[in-house]
Amino acid sequence: MYSFMGGGLFCAWVGTILLVVATATDHWMQYRLSGSFAHQGLWRYCLGNKCFLQTESIAYWNATRAFMILSALCATSGIIMGVLAFAQQSTFTRLSRPFSAGIMFFASTLFVLLALAIYTGVTVSFLGRRFGDWRFSWSYILGWVALLMTFFAGIFYMCAYRMHECRRLATPR
């Protein structure tokens, strides 16, 4: 059980760090504009060596930002529950901490999937036509890696929960 929780906690830490870095950085998309390279993130866009805040309130950017922030918050909550799962005292007999941590990591995975799906759909259908020479960049890719890490953290914690439940049910009362 502890090895699953340890693996889950490792994946969760890495996934949460990647979520925060992906959300905060400005390299979701790179493109060529007027002969020079430009890149943009969720909060700023940069032309040459100058960066500017994205002041327009565009729905897909707002949705992507919100889902990325919710994902990071769920992952952080899952880490807290995951660390508390190592403690053996049962404060809540009906609430399993590994199960709760796993649910939080799956919620984090869902939120980051929604954010990346929205960003991908709009970028490919709208911005891809506007900028001929463009590509997704490393911040965007970190988001996908974070999705995998939070998903595997959820899997590990669910395995720890199942192992704990099987042992609990097998012991005579």
UniProtKB/Swiss-Prot annotation:
It is a multi-pass membrane protein. Keywords: Disease variant, Disulfide bond, Eye lens protein, Glycoprotein, Membrane, Phosphoprotein, Transmembrane, Transmembrane helix. Gene3D superfamilies: 1.20.140.150. The chain crosses the membrane at residues 4-24, 67-87, 99-119, 141-161. The modification Phosphothreonine is found at residue 171. Residues 25-66, 120-140 are extracellular. GO terms for biological process: camera-type eye development; lens development in camera-type eye. One of its GO terms (molecular function) is structural constituent of eye lens. One of its GO terms (cellular component) is bicellular tight junction. Residues 1-3, 88-98, 162-173 are cytoplasmic. Pfam families: PMP22_Claudin. It is found in: Membrane. Glycans are attached at residues 43, 61-62. Belongs to the PMP-22/EMP/MP20 family. Seems to be associated with itself or another lens membrane component via disulfide bonds. Present in the thicker 16-17 nm junctions of mammalian lens fiber cells, where it may contribute to cell junctional organization. Acts as a receptor for calmodulin. May play an important role in both lens development and cataractogenesis. It is linked to Defects in Lim2 are the cause of the cataractous mouse mutant with total opacity of lens 3 (To3). Mice heterozygous or homozygous for the To3 mutation have total opacity of the lens with a dense cataract. In addition, the To3/To3 homozygotes exhibit microphthalmia, abnormally small eyes. This is Lens fiber membrane intrinsic protein. It comes from Mus musculus (Mouse).
